[in-house]
Amino acid sequence: MTQAVDIGTIQTLIRLEVPDQVPLTGSIPYDALVKKLKTPVDPELLQRLIRFTRLVGFLDEDAEGAVKHSPMSAIFVNDPDTAGQARFMADFGIRPCSFIYESIKLDPSGEAARQGPLALMAREPGAREGPTFFEVLEKDPVNRKRWHDGMAVHNDSMVRHVAGAYDWGTVQSLVDIGGSEGHVAAVIVNAFPHIQITVQDLPEIIEKARQRGDRHPNIIFEEHDFFTPQPRIADAYFLRLILHDWNDADCTRIVRQISSALRPGARLLIMDAVLPEPGEGSLQSERRLRRSDIGMYTLFSAKERSLAQMRRLVEDCDSRLRFEKLYTPPGSHASMLSWICE
């Protein structure tokens, strides 16, 4: 109950857009604040909510009882990317969790994306299934932008680990599949300037990438749907934070499309979270990874995977793929797994 009240109250203030209407310096009385909100709310009720959330660090009051920012809530004014991620989580990260039980009743496997928690949250009234995560975002440009902005923040905090996650000196040509606008490719090629990298993603993303003025000459961009056959021949193929967005059946399709391009000696590189065995590693680390696993389920009907699950998924797709090693860079939440095609 305690955490539900904490999360639910902060979520409500975010969705009411209260932090957006509080000045970054100074304060604003409750009567004036409610007049700025798009959704009507009684000043006394809003005061009750804020006087609770201030105790957990979200918003605050001055000596006269007017509303002012706390360091946490000020992010919504001075850090748009992080704020977008928080707004996205308020809409999509929390609400689907209340549909987990109903989803299990409809789909005990947890693999059916149209009967997953988010799909049930977004479905038409009375329907037994709903849209997938990506279909929801396709019709919601505001949250689609928040999602991509949030991923940019997330990637910026993790991308520094990529250059040290693998011996890139052994790779001459690399295909970064689902590589977005090339931010990961840039980190690799800046550290290893001999590598030629092809970044593949959907047309909308590739178009944005090509418009950027800071493109490295060793990076080219190519439109590609990873559910279709891989058109490029290369030394290595890289899937970073891709497979955890998809269920086992879809991951099998993705890997098999890459397999069609593999030649002896080529490598498949996957960088994703790897679930530990219970009690393996620190409690904090395991909690973080298992929270991510449940998050993948609620949003995508997907999962984080253990090493055994990842190996089984990949090696069942192509018997030529021999597992080489797993390496987790210090401080990284994701691990690099490598296979060589024999």
Curated annotation (Swiss-Prot):
InterPro entries associated with the record: COMT-like (IPR016461), O_MeTrfase_dom (IPR001077), SAM-dependent_MTases_sf (IPR029063), WH-like_DNA-bd_sf (IPR036388), WH_DNA-bd_sf (IPR036390)
Family matches, as Pfam families: Methyltransf_2
GO molecular function: O-methyltransferase activity
PROSITE patterns: SAM_OMT_II
Keywords on record: Methyltransferase, S-adenosyl-L-methionine, Transferase, Virulence
The enzyme's E.C. designation: 2.1.1.293
Active-site residues per Swiss-Prot or TrEMBL entry: 244 (proton acceptor)
Annotated catalysed reactions: 6-hydroxytryprostatin B + S-adenosyl-L-methionine = tryprostatin A + S-adenosyl-L-homocysteine + H(+)
Pathway given in the UniProt record: Mycotoxin biosynthesis
Family: Belongs to the class I-like SAM-binding methyltransferase superfamily. Cation-independent O-methyltransferase family.
Name of the featured protein: 6-hydroxytryprostatin B O-methyltransferase
Organism, scientific name: Aspergillus fumigatus (strain ATCC MYA-4609 / CBS 101355 / FGSC A1100 / Af293) (Neosartorya fumigata)
Gene: ftmMT
